[in-house]
Amino acid sequence: MSAQRLNAAERDLEKFIKFLVLKSTQVVVQSRLGEKMQTQCNPLAGSDWFNIAVQDHPEVLDETKRALNLKTGESILQRLPLCVEISLKTTEGDQMVLEVWSLDLLQPQNGASPATNDLNPEGQTLKAAHAIYNRMGIMLKSLISLTRTTPAYKLSRRQCPDSYGIFYRIYVDRPQVHTLGEGHKHVKIGQLSTIVGSLVMSVAYRTKLTISPTAAQSESNTIMLKSDHFRPATDANTPGNQQQTQNGTVVAKKLGLGALNPAQGTADRRFIDIEKPLRPGAFTDMGKLKQYTEDDFVLPETPPFEWLLRGRGSVESLNRLDNNSVASVNISNNNNSTQDSKFNQISNLNNNSAGFKSFEKNSENSVSPIKSLLIPASATATYRHHSEPSLQPPPDDDNLLKELHFPFASPTSHVNDLAKFYRECYHAPPLKGLNELQAEISSISSTPPASSGSGGVAACGPTAAATAIATSSADASAMDDLSRQLEQFETSLEDYDKLVSQFGLTGSSSTGSRSSGGLQMSN
């Protein structure tokens, strides 16, 4: 009777161990899916093994049963240890084993069970069965907690099809810890003593997460091979797959939210041969194809975009033109010092405009559709500097050559109006100030009139009368010009305000034309 009870207790323990193995593989694999597991509280927990709600994944359950390969009447104690291997595989094809979970059964020494030595073996065996069932539940809870603490859990949460994926493999054999590299750690999750032996649950995980292709090679392999010597095998009859399917092992399966296509990782990579000539497309006229030679690939000695650079001849011609205009203005000023100032201003303006037009004719061969704005030193500025010797002239600065380029402007762009306005403002004749007018009037009035020596009475000859008339006419004309200019400025005050406001906001082309007209009115 006691032997029958003992056999029944052993069968119950074998049943408990079988479901512990199935639930352990489910816990390990589901923890590497890359998502958090949420289970609802079940008030009727009688149907849940070990009082833990662990949903069975059909694929994992089939892989576990295929690895155990239990036959009819065969005990699961003979198929232990069972291992679950978690590995990482990158998109480049590099693979690295992260951890190995194992559940092993250590047989009792001398073939004696601890329950047969007691006085009441039947009662001790029944109590041990219930205690073992509760201890198995505690061991399974410890496994759930520990699967979230290893480095592979963080890697599984970050997996994506573009970088790497997590795979699992279930096999019946001793844990292959040599694939974990140097410095791996081994942790014992729990140990449970039963009448059939001691159940030991442990994990060995990798600490160095650096992928090295030569880490998994054996020491005896000293043959140097090319990097692309081994091709990914797609046939199940290849030696690599046959080695994996021995001893009840199975091929590693893909984990994650969505499994990839099996042919995706095993497809041959396509390589592009640069030296191979390109083939023409369909319906191509072979006569129109250009045959390239080695001369077409020789880079020219001249720098690229040289045509955008301004030639030295244009600057030299501009300098010569500027020097000639300044010299001619100085000669004319020395010869005609008694002429009217208004006539001098008009002649200087004509000289400047003629010089600018001649420069534009010389620069007609420019490639850019918008001509660059080149402004030479005006003769009017030279005239003002000669008339005011007290002021220091500005530095030469390449003869006051100012240059503005618009290489990317279209012919209809508003930048032409801006250049025209700037050119007219730069060449505008200078206005005489009040100090200059007062100096001329005082110089004329300070000239003493001619007197006769006999009676002391002023002579009223034609020379004195002409001098007085010229003095009065000069004063009247100067005052008339000044009053006329002031009236024009006052009447055009609104236009100047609009001009200033438009320059501050938009700077349109109409502003330039109106402002240039206002400046021309001041002549």
UniProtKB/Swiss-Prot annotation:
What does the record note as the disruption phenotype of the gene behind this chain?
A: Results in late stage egg chambers that contain persisting nurse cell nuclei without fragmented DNA and attenuation of caspase-3 cleavage.
List Phosphoserine occurrences by residue.
Answer: 227, 314, 317
Please outline how this chain is modified post-translation. Answer: Phosphorylated in a nutrient-, TOR- and Atg1 kinase-dependent manner.
Q: Matching Pfam families, A to Z? A: ATG13
| Keyword Phosphoprotein recorded | yes
Per its record, what are the GO molecular function terms?
A: protein kinase regulator activity
GO annotation (BP), single: mitophagy
- Cellular location(s): Cytoplasm, Cytosol; Preautophagosomal structure
Q: Which InterPro entries match?
A: ATG13 (IPR040182), Atg13_N (IPR018731), HORMA_dom_sf (IPR036570)
Q: Which UniProt keywords apply?
A: Autophagy, Cytoplasm, Phosphoprotein
GO-annotated cellular components = Atg1/ULK1 kinase complex; autophagosome; cytosol; phagophore assembly site
Q: What family does this belong to?
A: Belongs to the ATG13 family. Metazoan subfamily.
Q: What does this protein do?
A: Autophagy factor required for autophagosome formation. Target of the TOR kinase signaling pathway that regulates autophagy through the control of the phosphorylation status of Atg13 and Atg1. The Atg1-Atg13 complex functions at multiple levels to mediate and adjust nutrient-dependent autophagic signaling. Involved in the autophagic degradation of dBruce which controls DNA fragmentation in nurse cells.
Q: What is this protein called?
A: Autophagy-related protein 13 homolog
Originating organism:
Drosophila melanogaster (Fruit fly)
Q: Which gene encodes it?
A: Atg13
